[in-house]
């Protein structure tokens, strides 16, 4: 096939214009095209007020080399179709079924691959099925009554279920895992456009249905799910995993235990540390969730002409400060909501979430400051966890259990806000005005303020006085890394640390890909379970 890149078209182009552009770029006729597939679609707004839609497409034709040479198009190349392949099965035999702990993206894709290959995985998830979990989350947002086992962090689908459902990743994977993840989501009900959009997203509403469909297929392939089943202990003999304990009362023997815990399984981290599993603190970032009117972000990113024609605009900002810290946007949610993402009593964390239509009137993003083990006395593997907890306890107290909020101008002046400015907050969960100064160290607070002013150089009025900040954004990534070797095993053999909670991914797609890598390691070593 021939891949043609840099196909620029007007924002409001027709399908006929799209085909004509391809025909002209390769100097071919319509009937010569046997098959066509969009590889990438993005918005180019670098030369506002002119904005273009830019495509890369794969075109299947006869006599590819001849057509390519005749076209003289420097943006066209012959490429081979790349399909993901599962490795050959190993020779060792299982005595017991492989266990996967956690049904987030890493655990689900690990289980899916194992199930497809006949390994009959047994998945334990501390939370509930996605439909019941959603009911618990909505109840929490309405009443403030938290279920510590079923919330924004815990339950089928993982923390990403209540986010924007972003699927972009910076991970380059020559083996095609990234495309496999996207194609799998599409096969279970996600829109096909996620396979080619530059910044694909599903949205919480659709992702929930996709996750449930994926679970049903894993069950059909011989896998098993046990919900409301928290791993409370493990049995180790001769530095090998022998069994896992569920809910303090049931032991399940296994030789393979995939730890796809998620970044908020703090009690499980504590339990694992006591067993001698090697883990270490890692750098992460903390800050606030910041809201602006989406129409203003659209105008800044697209220009006045296209601000209302195009989809809700995303942004990405970053600054490296003189004090050595980085300040940057994270998990930006166009047309999104700030949500109460707490999972522990008397502690409060926030996150951002969008539905598939990104229809909220506000844009929000975490604006976060980098922290290292030096900031939280990182001598103990779980020191980052305790750092997070202290911040979340402060945030809970500041809002009396509600999301504490403040206008950016008041934050700079170190005074409590008493009302919104020209726009109000879009949240899921109750809110309360507070003074968020004192939540972080002086240096980190000044870094946040300096970063906000710096970003205003790129996005006008990013540092507007009535920008709404909500605290605390503390769960940006895992504060822990569970060490693993080149075959993905921990120092306790048979344990496979996996995904974001183990410190090897950041976001839905990279976590899913890491789940696949761990499944591949198990497949290379063992025969399917019989």
Each PLM stretch: what is its role?
Residues 3-53, 57-184, 188-530:
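Residues forming the flavin
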């Amino acid at each position: 096939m021939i891949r043609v890149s840099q196909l620029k078209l007007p924002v409001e182009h027709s399908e006929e214009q799209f085909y004509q552009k391809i025909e002209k770029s390769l100097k071919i006729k319509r009937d010569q095209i046997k098959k066509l597939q969009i590889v990438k679609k993005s918005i180019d707004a670098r030369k506002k007020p002119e904005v273009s839609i830019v495509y890369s497409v794969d075109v299947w034709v006869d006599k590819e080399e001849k057509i390519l040479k005749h076209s003289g198009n420097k943006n066209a190349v012959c490429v081979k179709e790349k399909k993901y392949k599962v490795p050959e099965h190993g020779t060792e035999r299982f005595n017991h079924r492989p266990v996967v702990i956690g049904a987030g993206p890493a655990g689900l894709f690990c289980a899916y691959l194992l199930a497809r290959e006949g390994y009959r995985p047994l998945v334990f998830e501390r939370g509930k099925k996605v439909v019941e979990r959603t009911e618990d989350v909505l109840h929490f947002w309405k009443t403030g009554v938290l279920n510590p086992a079923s919330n924004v962090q815990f339950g089928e689908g993982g923390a990403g279920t209540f986010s924007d459902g972003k699927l972009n990743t910076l991970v380059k994977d020559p083996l095609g895992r990234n495309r496999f993840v996207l194609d799998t989501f599409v096969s279970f009900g996600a829109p096909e456009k996620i396979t080619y959009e530059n910044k694909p997203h599903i949205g919480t509403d659709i992702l929930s249905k996709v996750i449930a469909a994926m679970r049903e297929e894993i069950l059909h392939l011989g896998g098993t799910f046990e919900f409301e089943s928290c791993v409370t202990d493990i049995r180790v003999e001769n530095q090998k995993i022998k069994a896992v304990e569920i809910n303090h009362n049931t032991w399940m023997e296994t030789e393979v235990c995939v730890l796809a815990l998620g970044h908020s399984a703090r009690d499980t981290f504590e339990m694992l540390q006591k067993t001698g599993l090697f883990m270490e603190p890692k750098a992460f970032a903390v800050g606030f969730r910041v809201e602006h009117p989406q129409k203003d972000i659209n105008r800044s990113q697209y220009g006045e002409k296209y601000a209302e024609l195009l989809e809700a605009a995303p942004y990405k900002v970053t600054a490296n400060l003189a004090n050595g810290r980085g300040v940057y946007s994270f998990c930006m949610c166009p047309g999104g909501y700030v949500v109460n993402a707490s999972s522990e009593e008397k502690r409060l964390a926030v996150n951002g979430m969008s539905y598939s239509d990104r229809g909220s009137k506000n844009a929000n993003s975490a604006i976060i400051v980098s922290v290292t083990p030096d900031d939280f006395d990182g001598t103990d593997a779980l020191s980052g966890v305790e750092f997070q907890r202290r911040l979340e306890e402060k945030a809970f107290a500041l809002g009396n259990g509600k999301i504490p909020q403040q206008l950016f101008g008041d934050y700079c002046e170190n005074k409590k806000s008493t009302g919104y400015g020209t726009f109000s907050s879009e949240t899921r969960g109750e809110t309360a005005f507070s003074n968020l100064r004192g939540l972080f160290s002086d240096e980190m607070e000044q870094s946040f303020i300096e970063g906000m002013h710096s970003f205003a150089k790129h996005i006008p009025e990013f540092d507007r006085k009535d920008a709404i900040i909500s605290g605390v954004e503390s769960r940006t990534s895992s504060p822990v890394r569970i060490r693993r070797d080149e075959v993905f095993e921990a120092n306790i053999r048979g344990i496979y640390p996996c995904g974001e909670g183990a410190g090897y991914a950041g976001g839905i797609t990279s976590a899913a890909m890491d789940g696949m890598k761990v499944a591949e390691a198990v497949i290379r070593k063992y025969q399917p379970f019989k």
